[in-house]
């Protein structure tokens, strides 16, 4: 009999099979993947099952999950009881249990998989949400209790893992506050077992590795949050750090208090995947504050249906600055009685418009503008292959930001450099004696 020592924080997890779903999130080196491999091996020794191990890219299995299972099997002295096959990549147990390894980069191969009662999705944040839902459909067996294990390092709160297992602001769906998980470490919510871990939970980890993780705090706070703290958050550099959400009534009161408010409306066109986005803005030119107090956000809409839903603009005759790349749509809306013109577009306009919005000292958004909040509150810059920021590209396609760009087409926000330059200019007027 072999006695196997495990990290205390994982003891309950290794032997707990009460829930259908188990979601493990944690930092680097926390041993969540190791204990998941151990958990599955012990389960398959006890019961005849077929388990499916998934990663986004199949070729990453051999040096990660497959190697991890081989390590566990060797440590348990089971090399004669479990056969390792390289083609196809598979582990076969003496009692008929099997572990199969597949990648979501070749979904056709999943169609040949049957009677799967246990699925482990390693680095599940890398798998697409559609893939996750497809795997739920593959989890079926006529007799055995079904289980799905998801393990991941935390990424941004925009990732599907956070929206599915914790909260989705856009769909007003709340499951669990992630801060509660960080505090309690393990939580059962419905049919899901949650587990949080960090390097501190791995008693077999060298102290030098922990110090290396601690050092991230000085030069890479995003990676420190992920790797050392094991926590979700905003990933990357925010485009609009001055963006704040306020109650709608408060936003209206602030706008009413502006001595000379400037009102603007902008529209970005969409159809299938992209959205028709319209925003109403108010500018406080003295304070350089931007207020966003109304939105329209729909996709899969033809121009005639959109025009009907926006009929109030015909009555108010507000000027709408729209995406000039859609001249036919603009012409149609004009024929229906809308005051609509195309906003200027030119080489580099994306960057210039973004810089203009960034020059506002504060951006206040009504809590009724849910899609503006969803797109802009945590909007971050995209990066090139070398990790450098791309100043006019973002991690998502923010249609509401485009609408704001167009709304502000003919309005300029003075930046600090220009203001400072004006203040430093000498007064050319001769003093009166």
Curated annotation (Swiss-Prot):
Coiled coil segments of this chain: none
Keyword annotations of the record: Viral genome packaging, Viral release from host cell
Pfam families noted in UniProt: Terminase_3, Terminase_3C
Keyword Transcription assigned: no
Disulfide-linked positions: none
Protein's job: Functions as a terminase.
Entry's family note: To B.subtilis YqaT and phage SPP1 terminase large subunit.
Subunit annotation: Dimer of a small and a large subunit.
Name of the molecule in the record: PBSX phage terminase large subunit
Gene: xtmB
């Amino acid at each position: 009999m072999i006695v196997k020592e495990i990290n205390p924080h994982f003891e309950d997890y290794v032997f707990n099979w009460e829930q259908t779903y188990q979601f493990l999130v944690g930092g680097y080196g926390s041993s969540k993947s190791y204990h998941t491999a151990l958990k599955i091996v012990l389960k398959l020794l006890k019961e005849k099952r077929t388990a499916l191990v998934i990663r986004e890219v199949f070729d990453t299995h051999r040096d990660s999950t497959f190697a991890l299972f081989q390590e566990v099997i060797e440590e348990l002295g089971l090399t004669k009881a479990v056969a390792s096959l390289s083609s196809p990549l598979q582990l076969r147990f003496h009692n008929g249990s099997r572990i199969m390894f597949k990648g979501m980069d070749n979904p056709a191969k999943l169609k040949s998989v049957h009677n799967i009662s246990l699925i482990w999705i390693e680095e599940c944040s890398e798998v697409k949400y559609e893939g996750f839902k497809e795997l739920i459909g593959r989890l079926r067996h006529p007799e055995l209790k079904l289980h799905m294990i998801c393990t991941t390092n935390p990424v941004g709160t925009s990732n599907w893992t956070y929206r599915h297992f914790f909260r989705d602001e856009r769909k007003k769906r709340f499951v669990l506050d992630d801060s509660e998980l960080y505090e309690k470490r393990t939580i059962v919510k419905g049919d899901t077992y949650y587990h949080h871990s960090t390097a501190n939970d791995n008693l077999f980890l060298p102290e030098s590795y922990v110090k290396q993780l601690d050092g991230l705090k000085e030069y890479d706070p995003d990676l420190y949050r992920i790797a050392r703290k094991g926590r979700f958050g905003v990933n990357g550099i925010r485009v609009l750090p001055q963006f704040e959400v306020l109650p709608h009534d408060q936003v209206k009161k602030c706008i009413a208090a502006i001595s000379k408010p400037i009102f603007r409306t902008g529209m970005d066109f969409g159809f299938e995947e992209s959205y028709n986005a319209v925003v109403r803005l108010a500018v406080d030119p003295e304070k350089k504050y931007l207020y966003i107090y109304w939105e329209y956000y729909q996709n899969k809409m033809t121009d005639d249906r959109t025009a009907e839903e926006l009929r109030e603009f015909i009555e108010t005759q507000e000027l709408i600055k729209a995406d000039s790349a859609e001249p036919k749509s603009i012409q149609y809306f004009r024929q229906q009685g809308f005051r609509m013109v195309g906003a200027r577009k030119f080489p580099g306009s994306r960057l210039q418009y973004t810089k203009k919005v960034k020059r506002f000292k504060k951006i206040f958004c009504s809590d009724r503008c849910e899609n503006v909040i969803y797109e802009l509150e945590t909007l971050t810059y995209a990066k090139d292959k070398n990790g450098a920021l791309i100043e006019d590209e973002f991690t998502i396609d923010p249609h509401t930001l485009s609408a704001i760009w167009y709304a502000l087409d003919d309005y300029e926000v003075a930046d600090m450099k220009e203001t400072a330059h004006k203040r430093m200019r000498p007064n050319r007027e001769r003093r009166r004696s």
